[in-house]
């Protein structure tokens, strides 16, 4: 190694590394809070104009299903189809919410797959 070359890890690089570590810690703390927030959220999926509702958490955990008594005369197959449609609606809303919140959390970072 020639005089003055070192390892190429000077003071500027150390500051960059320290900033990157700090940002990673902030993201980790934010991710923990986000997970807690998602668990507390209630996201509603609907079908048949609200006659069927599926409520799930922000991380896609099913909470409850609400079916209007007016639908019970329609038969099991119709009710099952509407519950499925409401589940899909809730899932889509939940994953969209999760993705948006993750983008907010990781904003400004160059992370693969985000």
Swiss-Prot record:
It comes from the Bacteria. SUPFAM superfamilies: YbaB-like (SSF82607). GO terms for molecular function: DNA binding. Keywords: Cytoplasm, DNA-binding. It is found in: Cytoplasm, Nucleoid. The keyword Amino-acid biosynthesis does not apply. The keyword Cytoplasm applies. GO terms for cellular component: bacterial nucleoid; cytosol. It holds the Pfam family YbaB_DNA_bd. Gene3D superfamilies: Nucleoid-associated protein YbaB-like domain (3.30.1310.10). Binds to DNA and alters its conformation. May be involved in regulation of gene expression, nucleoid organization and DNA protection. PANTHER family: NUCLEOID-ASSOCIATED PROTEIN YBAB. Homodimer. Belongs to the YbaB/EbfC family. This is Nucleoid-associated protein Cyan7425_0899.
């Amino acid at each position: 190694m020639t005089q003055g070359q070192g390892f190429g890890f000077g003071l500027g690089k150390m500051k960059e590394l320290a900033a990157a570590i700090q940002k990673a810690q902030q993201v980790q703390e934010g991710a923990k809070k986000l997970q807690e927030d998602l668990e507390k959220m209630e996201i509603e999926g609907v079908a048949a104009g609200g006659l069927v509702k599926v409520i799930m958490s922000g991380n896609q955990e099913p909470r409850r299903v609400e079916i209007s008594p007016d639908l019970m005369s329609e038969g099991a197959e119709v009710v099952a189809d509407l519950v499925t449609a409401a589940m899909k609606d809730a899932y889509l809303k939940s994953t969209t919410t999760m993705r948006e919140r993750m983008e907010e959390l990781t904003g400004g970072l160059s992370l693969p797959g985000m």
